[in-house]
């Protein structure tokens, strides 16, 4: 035993010498935090730390100089700390969870053998402000014993997360905990500019004691860079955070797969069904049990008979509603149970079965009797499945086409693209159940995510729409669309009456760097146009080239471009509001021409509504004009991912799509035919201002506030009172009170009938100011004569030409 004892004594001596020698080594500055751990202060120096009530106090004390430091003990106010559920003691780290005033005091980390102090901290736990009101922070300015100096961060490890992404409507808090002597001040910048409460709808909360900025109910316009500036007379420091606000998903509730799960219970036991619901909009949850009425589980209309077991009450929470508890189950409790969850978009449901078994002693007898039958049944089912597999393989071989020649390209990847169906049905409809699928085989030697160099795509041929590539001659580019480029072309065989005569068409095709999603979207748009059918006032599908090369989608060509530029090009010449003073003016428009434009667009939207299609982006820029001045609505078949569209930022040419959106679409992402009617009212305003920009000079943040307060745009100069009343009805705050497109067609037809053909526009009337760059000029939001707003929420009297609403 002599040798082991000597070795143990030698180890202890080495540890003591190493601890003593470490006193002479330099140390780095220590940082307190929940995540990062860095060296602590030099022995003898006391670190002053301030924590909020309820925070986790975490003290870190690495070995000085990085060497060994042996066993340690943590001491508070001279008394050793005893580990507990709230006090977590480690060799180099101490955590005190849910801190309170009693946890304030002097903490130190000491070597157990020598009692040498390795790190020393002074901790003070303060109350967080009880409300969001601004605090003056004077109680933070007392002398803390720290030497006079520039500001510094006290909790830098809590500031590591510089990018914050949160869903809309959440509360965001940025913190910059700092100290200095004298106590520094803190100010906030957004995108490099001073940020105050009046700069944001809903305001902000500045909690100086917490060195924090709080924003409640964030919206996408709150995106940006937020910088805290902490300074005193000796210096300043700053930290920048980036905030990204994620759009609310316009989707019916999503239920977690596999829940509720089937249950098997013994008579008299307790059972719980669980249903996990995910929904951005507030969900409503119910638990249902399927029952029989007169021996039938469904009614004459196919609706199942159910009993509501659990639903929302005054004091129930969503978490409570996600669990259905059944106590002391009986045989009558066996059956099908459904979790039904709904929101403003639609409904989702999952079902599960409960099987109730007799008591355990009865089960033993049943098992013995049933084991023989189970064995026979399993062998029989296995043999039957084997026969089915053999028959299926044989049938597939007989029906399979002959293999391609050696010169044919190899199919490297087959993708099954779910096509986003733009025919948006009523809010309770299941979009997924009606989603068409098109099987697409990519023929290429590449395996990358793009479709570059793809010479051929295998799409199922549709004889009704397929056009031979030999009959198509591509021409000049017309522009770039969502999925690729659009070119002019001449097609032979489009007009069945004159099959040999070439017809000018527009061809949509993918760009060279297109992705699989771009292909899916273009195919989706094509399929949507097939389903919606033809109408004079929409852009119609003419054909497609899907075989033997790139995908080409042929649509009608509109020679005069979009309605917005069509109107601007026909503004009276010689004035500063004309679209292009260097270009000869086009034909002058009469008042009846403008009413005709509106009437035709209403006709097109009436047809789309009858086909259950919601446009979601109706504006003059999405209406095209043919050579014969026929209005055609475009882009109604686009597979828009509406919760990813950034409607809160300017587009490249300065337009703000929020200005066409109904309040329920803008704030809640609810799109209906009624929200399209609101957009139609804005389009009417565009028409009668000859392509004016809605709400000129109004910042987006102020627009939100003004719309909520009921402000609406004033009557355009070249618009009658009756037409303005139609606009105002389209802008009713309640979607159900807005006219339908069928009613709008009737109203505009009535106005068109009584309008004189020779009634030209008043050239002396002022138009909305427009600059080719699309930048809005600053203007007042007051309600004066030049304001673009009117204050009354509803018109004082119904339009004389509008008729009654039903």
From Swiss-Prot:
Acidic residues compositional bias, start-end: 132-145
Every Protein kinase domain range: 472-761
Consequence the record notes for mutating residue 513 to N: In LADD2; uncertain significance
Effect ascribed to mutating residue 538 to V: In hypochondroplasia
Active site residues according to the UniProt entry: 617
Gene3D superfamilies listed in its UniProt record: 6.10.250.1740, Immunoglobulins, Phosphorylase Kinase, domain 1, Transferase(Phosphotransferase) domain 1
Disorder named in the UniProt entry: Achondroplasia: A frequent form of short-limb dwarfism. It is characterized by a long, narrow trunk, short extremities, particularly in the proximal (rhizomelic) segments, a large head with frontal bossing, hypoplasia of the midface and a trident configuration of the hands. ACH is an autosomal dominant disease.
Low complexity biased stretches: 771-787
Keyword Ribosomal protein (UniProt): no
Effect annotated for changing residue 650 to M: In KERSEB, ACH, TD1 and SADDAN; constitutively activated kinase with impaired internalization and degradation, resulting in prolonged FGFR3 signaling
Transmembrane segments: 376-396
Record PTM: Autophosphorylated. Binding of FGF family members together with heparan sulfate proteoglycan or heparin promotes receptor dimerization and autophosphorylation on tyrosine residues. Autophosphorylation occurs in trans between the two FGFR molecules present in the dimer. Phosphorylation at Tyr-724 is essential for stimulation of cell proliferation and activation of PIK3R1, STAT1 and MAP kinase signaling. Phosphorylation at Tyr-760 is required for interaction with PIK3R1 and PLCG1. Ubiquitinated. Is rapidly ubiquitinated after ligand binding and autophosphorylation, leading to receptor internalization and degradation. Subject to both proteasomal and lysosomal degradation.
Pfam families: FGFR3_TM, I-set, Ig_3, PK_Tyr_Ser-Thr
Effect of residue 373 to C: In KERSEB and TD1; disulfide-linked dimer with constitutive kinase activation
Tissue specificity of this protein: Expressed in brain, kidney and testis. Very low or no expression in spleen, heart, and muscle. In 20- to 22-week old fetuses it is expressed at high level in kidney, lung, small intestine and brain, and to a lower degree in spleen, liver, and muscle. Isoform 2 is detected in epithelial cells. Isoform 1 is not detected in epithelial cells. Isoform 1 and isoform 2 are detected in fibroblastic cells.
Residue(s) carrying Phosphoserine: 444-445
Function: Tyrosine-protein kinase that acts as a cell-surface receptor for fibroblast growth factors and plays an essential role in the regulation of cell proliferation, differentiation and apoptosis. Plays an essential role in the regulation of chondrocyte differentiation, proliferation and apoptosis, and is required for normal skeleton development. Regulates both osteogenesis and postnatal bone mineralization by osteoblasts. Promotes apoptosis in chondrocytes, but can also promote cancer cell proliferation. Required for normal development of the inner ear. Phosphorylates PLCG1, CBL and FRS2.
Impact after mutating residue 248 to C: In KERSEB, BLC, keratinocytic non-epidermolytic nevus and TD1; severe and lethal; also found as somatic mutation in one patient with multiple myeloma; constitutive dimerization and kinase activation
Outcome recorded upon mutating residue 540 to T: In hypochondroplasia
Enzyme Commission designation: 2.7.10.1
Name of the molecule in the record: Fibroblast growth factor receptor 3
Phosphotyrosine modifications at: 647-648, 724, 760
Species whose genome carries this gene: Homo sapiens (Human)
Keyword Transmembrane helix recorded: yes
GO biological process, any: bone mineralization
InterPro entries reported for this sequence: FGF_rcpt_fam, Ig-like_dom, Ig-like_dom_sf, Ig-like_fold, Ig_I-set, Ig_sub, Ig_sub2, Kinase-like_dom_sf
GO molecular function: ATP binding; fibroblast growth factor binding; fibroblast growth factor receptor activity; identical protein binding; protein tyrosine kinase activity
């Amino acid at each position: 035993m002599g040798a082991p004892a000597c070795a143990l004594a030698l180890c202890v001596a080495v540890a003591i010498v190493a601890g003593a020698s470490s006193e002479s080594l330099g140390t780095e500055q220590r940082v307190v935090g929940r995540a990062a751990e860095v060296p602590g202060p030099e022995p003898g120096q006391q670190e002053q730390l301030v924590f909020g009530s309820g925070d986790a106090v975490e003290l870190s004390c690495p070995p000085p100089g990085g060497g060994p430091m042996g066993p340690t003990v943590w001491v508070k106010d001279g008394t050793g700390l005893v580990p507990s559920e709230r006090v977590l003691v480690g060799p180099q780290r101490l955590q005190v969870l849910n801190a309170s005033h009693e946890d304030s005091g002097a903490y130190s980390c000491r070597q157990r053998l020598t009692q040498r102090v390795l790190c020393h901290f002074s901790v003070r736990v303060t109350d967080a402000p009880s409300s969001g009101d601004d605090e003056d922070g004077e109680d933070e300015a007392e002398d803390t014993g720290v030497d006079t100096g520039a500001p510094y961060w006290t909790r830098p490890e809590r500031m590591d997360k510089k990018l914050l992404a949160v869903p809309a409507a959440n509360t965001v808090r940025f913190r910059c905990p700092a100290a200095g002597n004298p106590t520094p001040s803190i100010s906030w910048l957004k995108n490099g500019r001073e940020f105050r409460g009046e700069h944001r709808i809903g305001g902000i909360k500045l909690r100086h004691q917490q060195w924090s900025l709080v924003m409640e109910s964030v919206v996408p316009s709150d995106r940006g860079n937020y910088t805290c500036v902490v300074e005193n007379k000796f210096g300043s420091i700053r930290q920048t955070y980036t905030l990204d606000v994620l759009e609310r998903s316009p989707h019916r509730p999503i239920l977690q797969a596999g829940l509720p799960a089937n249950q098997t219970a013994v008579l008299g036991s307790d059972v719980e069904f669980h249903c996990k619901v995910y929904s951005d909009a507030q969900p409503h949850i119910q638990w249902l049990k399927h029952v029989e009425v007169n021996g039938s589980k469904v009614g004459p209309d196919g609706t199942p008979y159910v009993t509501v077991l659990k639903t929302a009450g005054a004091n129930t929470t969503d978490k409570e509603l996600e669990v259905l508890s059944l106590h002391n189950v009986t045989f009558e409790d066996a059956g099908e149970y459904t979790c039904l969850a709904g929101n403003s978009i639609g409904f989702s449901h999952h079902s599960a079965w409960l099987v109730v078994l007799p008591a355990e002693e009865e089960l033993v007898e049943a098992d013995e009797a049933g084991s023989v039958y189970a064995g026979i049944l399993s062998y029989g089912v296995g043999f039957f499945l084997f026969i089915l597999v053999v028959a299926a393989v044989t049938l597939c071989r007989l029906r399979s086409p002959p293999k391609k020649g050696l010169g044919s390209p190899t199919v490297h990847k087959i993708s099954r693209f779910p096509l986003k169906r733009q025919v948006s049905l009523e809010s309770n409809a299941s979009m997924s159940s009606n989603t068409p699928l098109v099987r697409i085989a990519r023929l290429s030697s590449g395996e990358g995510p793009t479709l570059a160099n793809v010479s051929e795509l295998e799409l199922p041929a549709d004889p009704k729409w397929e056009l031979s590539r030999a009959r198509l001659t591509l021409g000049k580019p017309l522009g770039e669309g969502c999925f690729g480029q659009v070119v002019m072309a001449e097609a032979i065989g489009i007009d069945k009456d004159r099959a040999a005569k070439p017809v000018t068409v527009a061809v949509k095709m993918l760009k060279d760097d297109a992705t699989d999603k771009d292909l899916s979207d273009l195919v989706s748009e094509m399929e949507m146009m097939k389903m919606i059918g033809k109408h004079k006032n929409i852009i119609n599908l003419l054909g497609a080239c899907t075989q033997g090369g790139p995908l080409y989608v042929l649509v009608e060509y509109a020679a005069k471009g979009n309605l917005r530029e069509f109107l601007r090009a026909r503004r009276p010449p010689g004035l500063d509001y004309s679209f292009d003073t260097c270009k000869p003016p086009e034909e002058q428009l009469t008042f009846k021409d403008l009413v005709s434009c509106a009437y035709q667009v209403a006709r097109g939207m009436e047809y789309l509504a009858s086909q259950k299609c919601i446009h979601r982006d109706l504006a003059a820029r999405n209406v095209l004009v043919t050579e014969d001045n026929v209005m055609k609505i475009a882009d109604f078949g686009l597979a828009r991912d509406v919760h990813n569209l950034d409607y809160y930022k300017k587009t490249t040419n300065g337009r703000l799509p929020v200005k066409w959106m109904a309040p329920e679409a803008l704030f809640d992402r609810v799109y209906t035919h009624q929200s399209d009617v609101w957009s139609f009212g804005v389009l009417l305003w565009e028409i009668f201002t000859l392509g004016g920009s809605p709400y000129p000079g109004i910042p987006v943040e102020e627009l939100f506030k003004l719309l909520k307060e009921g402000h609406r745009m004033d009557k355009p100069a070249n618009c009658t009172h009756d037409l303005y009343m139609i606009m105002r009805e389209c802008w009713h705050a309640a979607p159900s009170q807005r006219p339908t497109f069928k009613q709008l067609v009737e109203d505009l037809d009535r106005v068109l009938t009584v309008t004189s053909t020779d009634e030209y526009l008043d050239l002396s009337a002022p138009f909305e100011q427009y600059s080719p760059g699309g930048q809005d000029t600053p203007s007042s939001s007051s309600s004066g004569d030049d304001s673009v707003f009117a204050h009354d929420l509803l018109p004082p009297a119904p339009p004389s030409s509008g008729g009654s609403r039903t």
